């Protein structure tokens, strides 16, 4: 069977069955690579990045022994998207005003006027 790189793509999360070698993705059947917020829609701090990475690693461990197929990758991506929304709603993450397009894809920001 031919080696095929699988990927799952949501608006803010891309997951590949690959590893990064010399700045290029190379297929690896037992490794996942996370590309987070490729459009730089959010302003990330170290704590929020650590929380995402921790959740990503937990989700991978939960699936130990399972095939890394499209379905499993989509489930991981969806859970990471959900965590991004929670971080945004809790004020641990904010929209990037210098982003290419401001569309508030995870909902309008909470401000004192809205609360």
UniProtKB/Swiss-Prot annotation:
It is found in: Cellular thylakoid membrane. NDH-1 can be composed of about 15 different subunits; different subcomplexes with different compositions have been identified which probably have different functions. It comes from Prochlorococcus marinus (strain MIT 9312). Its main location: membrane. Its EC number is 7.1.1.-. This is NAD(P)H-quinone oxidoreductase subunit M. GO terms for molecular function: oxidoreductase activity, acting on NAD(P)H, quinone or similar compound as acceptor; quinone binding. It catalyses: a plastoquinone + NADH + (n+1) H(+)(in) = a plastoquinol + NAD(+) + n H(+)(out); a plastoquinone + NADPH + (n+1) H(+)(in) = a plastoquinol + NADP(+) + n H(+)(out). It is a peripheral membrane protein. The keyword Membrane applies. GO terms for cellular component: plasma membrane-derived thylakoid membrane. Pfam families: NdhM.
């Amino acid at each position: 069977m031919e080696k095929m790189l699988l990927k799952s793509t949501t608006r803010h999360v891309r997951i590949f069955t690959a590893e990064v070698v010399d700045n290029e993705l190379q297929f690896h059947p037992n490794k996942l690579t996370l590309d987070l917020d490729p459009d730089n829609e959010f302003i990330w701090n170290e704590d929020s990045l650590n929380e995402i990475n921790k959740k990503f690693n937990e989700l991978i461990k939960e699936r130990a022994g399972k095939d890394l197929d499209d379905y499993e990758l989509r489930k991981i991506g969806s859970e990471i998207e959900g965590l991004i929304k929670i971080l945004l709603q809790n004020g641990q993450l904010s929209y990037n005003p210098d982003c290419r397009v401001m569309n508030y894809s995870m909902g309008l920001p909470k401000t004192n006027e809205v609360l």
